[in-house]
């Protein structure tokens, strides 16, 4: 795929040091965020810098490098990694890990729109376990995040949840007298401009858990937030597990700082306990091997075959799209030739699309109802996981039950077949396991038998998974010690988090 138009790079040029810039993903009051790739490793990265008009000595410029330092010092796999930082054309920049998936706020919002349901409680608890693990690591290195919220929990079906955006984070020693953050997830003391410490992150995590489960912030207005007599508006608990969850989250949302949990270590264990009780325990029971090229995960059949995808019988066909939406090569060209130029015209009318996005158009004269244009890769750089998640959510939003998909990004963008299959199938598995999806069949259609066999092998591994352990290994018997029935045997389940 070609690089993004120069206009989207906002004067940064084609590259910063070893990073080739694709284009701008978004911007805030003082900062801009770009998608790029390492020129040698071909891995996607996120580059954050300040807007061109912001002076190099400004608060915003200082924060970019401060964010890089704070992220880099936190030793946790649950924190988005800082990979590089420095100055470029008198502008500070931060290079950070790209998480190939969507954030929890988008996942929750789109499920509610498409399916009329939010996230299952087990998933909320697992996400919060990861968030608390990240925050605990931050606190143990003296860092207070100060902006914990669903949109800062970045989820990859392959690697799990990571906490990101440390843009207003501060060290414990300097976290004082500054009102910054997102009001809906901000504790009262932070809103008042008082000194804040890790207790602010305990509140932020509680507000995030509340929002992920119930689709709204715990307080509807600033007045409610500041009123010490106003409690979070929990709906009636539907189960003992949910009552347990509400008790835990309620303690995190205590307006009196002294009554909140002192840290997130015990909170993390409680989330682990709830998630462990509720999660479908053994994913092997949800996987059915139908035949060599057909599997079933829960109620969704996944079938893989060779052939021409343009003739697929499906409600929607996914196209491996480029960011400018032209359909002149690969699967896109085949769909345009069979379905008509109207498909390309509709896609291009929406303008260039960012990597990882997915856009729906009509299907022209194809048998399907829609074509879903998944912008999944660029020059060996894969965003296939994020694009697949959005394609699946879009299919649910459109009410589709059957999809036909190619191997995304493996053509002009040169993503390997294994990389593609892993990203697509882990995204599909998560989509199905979360529950509620309308999808009942996904047909993977490839041209070449050799490629199909490679894809099939990875797909089975991803869809089958390794299951949860049926037993707990508590260690080998001690040598030369007589086993006695009155001896103590204890497994401390509080020390085992969700897998």
Where are these regions (language model features)?
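Conserved N-lobe ATP-binding subsite of Hanks-type protein kinase domains
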Residues: 32
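AlphaC helix of the eukaryotic protein kinase fold
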Residues: 51-73
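Activation-segment/catalytic-loop signature of the eukaryotic protein kinase fold
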Residues: 85
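Conserved short submotifs of the Hanks-type protein kinase catalytic core
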Residues: 89-103
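Activation segment signature within eukaryotic-like protein kinase domains
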Residues: 127-128
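Protein kinase catalytic-loop region centered on the HRD/HxD motif
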Residues: 133-143
């Amino acid at each position: 795929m070609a690089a993004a138009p120069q206009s989207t790079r906002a004067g940064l040029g084609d590259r910063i040091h070893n990073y080739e810039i694709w284009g701008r993903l978004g911007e805030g009051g003082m900062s801009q965020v770009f998608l790029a790739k390492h020129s040698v490793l071909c891995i996607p990265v996120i580059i954050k810098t300040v807007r061109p008009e912001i002076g190099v000595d400004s608060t915003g410029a200082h924060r970019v490098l401060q964010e890089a330092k704070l992220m880099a010092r936190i030793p946790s796999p649950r924190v988005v990694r800082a990979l590089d930082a420095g100055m470029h054309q008198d502008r500070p920049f931060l290079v950070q890990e790209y998480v190939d998936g969507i954030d929890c706020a988008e996942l929750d919002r789109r499920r509610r729109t498409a399916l009329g349901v939010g996230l299952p409680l087990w998933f909320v608890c697992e996400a919060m376990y990861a968030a608390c693990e990240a925050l605990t690591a931050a606190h143990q290195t003296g860092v207070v995040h100060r902006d914990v919220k669903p949109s800062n929990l970045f989820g990859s079906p392959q690697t799990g949840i990571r906490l990101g955006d440390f843009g207003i984070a501060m060290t414990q020693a300097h976290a004082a007298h500054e009102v910054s953050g997102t009001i809906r997830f901000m504790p009262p003391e932070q809103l008042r401009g008082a000194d804040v410490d890790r207790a602010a992150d305990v509140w932020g995590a509680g507000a995030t858990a509340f929002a992920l489960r119930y689709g709204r912030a715990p307080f509807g207005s600033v007045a409610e937030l500041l009123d010490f007599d106003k409690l979070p508006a929990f709906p009636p608990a539907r189960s003992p597990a949910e009552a347990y969850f509400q008790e835990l989250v309620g303690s995190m949302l205590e307006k009196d700082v002294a009554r909140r949990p002192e840290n997130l270590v015990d909170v993390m264990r409680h989330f682990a306990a709830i998630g462990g009780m509720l999660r479908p325990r053994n994913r092997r029971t949800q996987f059915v091997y139908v035949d060599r090229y057909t599997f079933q995960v829960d109620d969704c059949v996944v079938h893989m075959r060779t052939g021409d995808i343009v003739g697929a019988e499906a409600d929607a066909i996914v196209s491996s799209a480029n960011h400018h939406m032209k359909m002149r090569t690969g699967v896109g060209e085949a769909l345009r030739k069979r379905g008509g130029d109207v498909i390309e015209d509709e896609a291009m009318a929406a303008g260039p699309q960012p990597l990882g996005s997915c856009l729906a158009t009509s299907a022209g004269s194809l048998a399907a109802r829609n074509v879903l244009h998944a912008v999944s890769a660029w020059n060996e750089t894969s965003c296939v996981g994020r694009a697949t998640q959005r394609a699946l959510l879009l299919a649910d939003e459109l009410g589709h039950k059957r999809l036909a998909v190619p191997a995304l990004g493996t053509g002009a963008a040169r993503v390997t077949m294994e990389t593609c299959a892993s990203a697509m199938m882990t995204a599909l598995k998560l989509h199905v396991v979360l529950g509620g999806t309308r999808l009942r069949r996904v047909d993977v259609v490839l041209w070449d038998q050799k490629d199909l066999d490679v894809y099939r092998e990875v797909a089975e591994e991803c869809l089958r998974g390794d299951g949860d352990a049926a037993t707990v290994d508590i260690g080998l018997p001690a040598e030369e010690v007589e086993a006695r029935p009155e001896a103590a045997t204890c497994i401390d389940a509080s020390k085992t988090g969700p897998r």
